[in-house]
């Protein structure tokens, strides 16, 4: 499971943009994982797109995660499935997928984090760390809550929400194992370049950490 640079798709960014070529640019820029998340497509549309994306991600050794739809994740042999509190409970998801794929779970408060430690999940998506324009109903948790969250759980935390290349260092310093982004990549015309800037910031943090020991 490598969710270092984790791109999450969103309907708003694909109204007049080709999905597959855009994702390929992000992959070439260096994303390590892709979460397929769409709310306004039919099951058939999503299945057909996921088949193409599964081939693409395999070719580049990038992990494919499906948001919410366990059935589609199983149908295309995704690497993981990501759910939230309004989706199927993680213990039910685990029964369905067995050990074939990992499970991610969204958490937006320290209180909820305490409740999910016992769940059969493999990573936690925690946020929103910063202000974001991607989600209208998001809850801002902040960087200090991220620091506390990392200390409260044994599960790896992937930070999400308003993360840009110049905030990568702060998020990783707080203990996040990876960064999940939408607009930091998809909000730019040059998707590959935007991805490369995130990857550069990520590598720079670990390089500095290595040499500061």
Regions found by a protein language model. Name each.
Residues 88-89, 132:
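A short, polar/charged loop-to-alpha-helix boundary motif
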Residues 73, 130-136:
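A short acidic, helix-capping loop that chelates divalent metal ions and anchors anionic groups
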Residues 38, 128-130:
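Short, histidine-centered active-site or binding-site loop motifs used for metal coordination
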Residues 126, 158-163, 179-183:
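Glycine-rich beta-strand-to-loop/alpha-helix junction loops that act as flexible
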Residues 1-88, 95-123, 141, 148, ...:
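Conserved N-terminal beta1-alpha1 strand-loop-helix module at the mouth
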Residues 174-178:
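Internal alpha/beta core interface subdomains
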């Amino acid at each position: 499971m490598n969710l270092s640079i984790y791109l999450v798709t969103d309907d708003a960014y694909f109204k007049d943009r080709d999905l597959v070529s855009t994702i390929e640019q992000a992959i070439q820029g260096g994303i390590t994982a892709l979460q397929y998340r769409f709310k306004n497509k039919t099951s058939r549309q999503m299945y057909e797109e996921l088949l193409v994306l599964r081939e693409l991600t395999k070719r580049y050794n990038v992990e494919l995660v499906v948001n919410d739809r366990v059935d589609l994740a199983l149908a295309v042999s995704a690497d993981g499935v990501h759910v939230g509190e309004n989706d199927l409970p993680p213990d039910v998801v685990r029964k369905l997928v067995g050990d074939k794929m990992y499970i991610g779970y969204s958490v937006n408060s320290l209180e909820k984090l305490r409740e999910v430690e016992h769940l059969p999940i493999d990573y936690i998506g925690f946020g929103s760390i910063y202000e974001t324009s991607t989600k209208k109903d998001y809850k801002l948790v902040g960087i200090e809550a991220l620091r506390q969250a990392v200390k409260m759980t044994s599960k790896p935390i992937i930070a999400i929400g308003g993360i840009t290349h110049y905030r990568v260092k702060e998020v990783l310093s707080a203990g996040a194992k990876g960064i999940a982004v939408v607009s930091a990549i998809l909000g730019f015309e040059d998707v590959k370049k935007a991805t490369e800037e995130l990857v550069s910031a990520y590598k720079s943090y670990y390089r500095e950490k290595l040499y500061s020991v």
